[in-house]
């Protein structure tokens, strides 16, 4: 019985692996490209292993997944394969009318996937957060400034306007431009992320105030099957969650 209960806690990791394998096989056959099988099998395997290690209490689990998945997407898909996996790349492929690269990535990780695993992308796979999580402010030391959250919508609108403008002006060598935008965009994200982390004494300040991807993730997480909820009937009002997330109440800390 003890073995059964121990194994049961790894079911979410197994389901996550099966989900990615289903996506991998489906895209392999529909797109007739072996890359999708290898790509999503690798990502799903890393995610499943990382969440299983996290469940087992291994402190390095999340960093392992971030480096394995985030590093792969940044260096191999982004730099070596020259695919813009940022939000500008999503708009680019969307306007081209093709379901590949960034459009597939966004559909799986940031638009429909969060209905199952919430903001798992932010915690386990984002290559920006991968670097920011090594900074010294793992626990926010200042209250969250809710009004600054509007900046993420500004970033979202600017990225859309930028790519729309490039298409409307029929700029030549657009594919090469998107690659350089990927490099420049990531450099700016890292610089802004580090600056905000030290300014607000919070590693994830960039995620809270500037990240445009949150515009997709924020509404989806409310319907997530794996969303963390506050069970008020079991709350002992220790306020640890409030201190950790600098929130005024336990309910707000888990929202």
Give short role names for the model-derived ranges.
Residues 248-255:
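Single conserved hydrophobic/aromatic residue that forms the stacking wall/gate
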Residues 1-243, 251:
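Non-ligating segments of multi-cofactor redox enzymes
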């Amino acid at each position: 019985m003890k073995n059964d209960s121990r194994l049961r806690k790894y079911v979410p990791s197994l389901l996550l692996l099966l989900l990615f394998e289903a996506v991998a096989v489906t895209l392999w056959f529909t797109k007739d490209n072996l890359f999708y099988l290898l790509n999503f099998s690798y990502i799903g395997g890393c995610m499943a292993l990382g969440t299983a290690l996290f469940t087992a209490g291994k402190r390095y689990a999340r960093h392992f997944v971030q480096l394995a998945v985030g590093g792969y997407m940044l260096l191999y898909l982004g730099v070596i394969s020259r695919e813009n996996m940022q939000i500008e790349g999503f708009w680019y492929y969307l306007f081209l009318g093709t379901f590949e690269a960034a459009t597939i990535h966004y559909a799986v990780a940031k638009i429909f996937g969060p209905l199952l695993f919430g903001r798992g992308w932010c915690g386990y796979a984002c290559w920006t957060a991968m670097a920011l999580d090594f900074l010294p402010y793992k626990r926010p030391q200042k209250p969250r400034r809710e009004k600054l959250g509007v900046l993420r919508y500004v970033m979202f609108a600017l990225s859309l306007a930028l790519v729309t403008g490039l298409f409307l002006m029929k700029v030549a060598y657009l594919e090469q431009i998107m690659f350089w935008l990927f490099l420049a965009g990531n450099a700016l994200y890292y610089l802004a992320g580090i600056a905000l982390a030290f300014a607000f004494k919070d590693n994830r300040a960039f995620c809270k105030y500037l990240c445009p991807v949150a515009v997709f993730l924020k509404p989806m997480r409310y319907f997530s099957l794996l969303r963390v909820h506050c069970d008020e009937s079991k709350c002992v009002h220790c306020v640890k969650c409030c201190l950790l997330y600098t929130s005024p109440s336990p309910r707000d800390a888990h929202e």
